[in-house]
Amino acid sequence: MGGGERYNIPDPQSRNASKNQQQHNRQKTKDQNSQMKIVHKKKERGHGYNPSAVQNGGKTKSLSNNSNWNASLSSPSLLFKSQASQNYAGAKFSEPPSPSVLPKPPSHWVHVSLNPSDKETMTFQLKTLLKVQV
C-alpha cells in the first residue's frame, strides 16, 4: 500500500501522430518488399536488364540457342542413352537375396537336431511370412 504505481498517460495528439508514422513506415516497407520481389522474380526468370537487347531493339540472339535446344529435344532417346548403358551395381529388389548373403542366425535360436520335414515346414513358414504382396 506504500508506493503507488504511476501510469504514463500519453497525449492523444502524439498517439495519433505515432500511429500515422507507424502506418507510413509499414507502407514504405511493403513498397520496398514488393519492389524487391519483382526484381528477384525477374532475375529468376533470366529477364534481367540486358543493354545489348535494348540496342538491338529488343531482339536477342537467343533464337540460335533455341534451335540447338529444340534439336536436342527432338530425339529424347539421345538424352537417356548414356544413362541406359550404365549398369546398376546394387541388388535388384525384384529378386530375393541369395542365402549366402544373408546373416546366419545365432546358434541358440535354432535347435540343431531338426528332422528334414521340420526344416521344410519351417522354411515354408518363413517364406510365406517374408513374401511381399505386389
Curated annotation (Swiss-Prot):
InterPro entries: PNRC-like_rgn, PNRC1/2. Residues 1-74 are annotated as: Disordered. Keywords: Activator, Cytoplasm, Nonsense-mediated mRNA decay, Nucleus, Transcription, Transcription regulation. One of its GO terms (biological process) is nuclear-transcribed mRNA catabolic process, nonsense-mediated decay. Interacts with UPF1/RENT1; preferentially interacts with hyperphosphorylated form. Interacts with DCP1A. Interacts with many nuclear receptors including ESR1, ESRRA, ESRRG, NR3C1/GR, NR5A1, PGR, TR, RAR and RXR. The interaction between PNRC2 and nuclear receptors is dependent on the SH3 binding motif. Involved in nonsense-mediated mRNA decay (NMD) by acting as a bridge between the mRNA decapping complex and the NMD machinery. May act by targeting the NMD machinery to the P-body and recruiting the decapping machinery to aberrant mRNAs. Required for UPF1/RENT1 localization to the P-body. Plays a role in glucocorticoid receptor-mediated mRNA degradation by interacting with the glucocorticoid receptor NR3C1 in a ligand-dependent manner when it is bound to the 5' UTR of target mRNAs and recruiting the RNA helicase UPF1 and the mRNA-decapping enzyme DCP1A, leading to RNA decay. Belongs to the PNRC family. PNRC2 subfamily. This is Proline-rich nuclear receptor coactivator 2. The lineage of its organism: Eukaryota, Metazoa, Chordata, Craniata, Vertebrata.
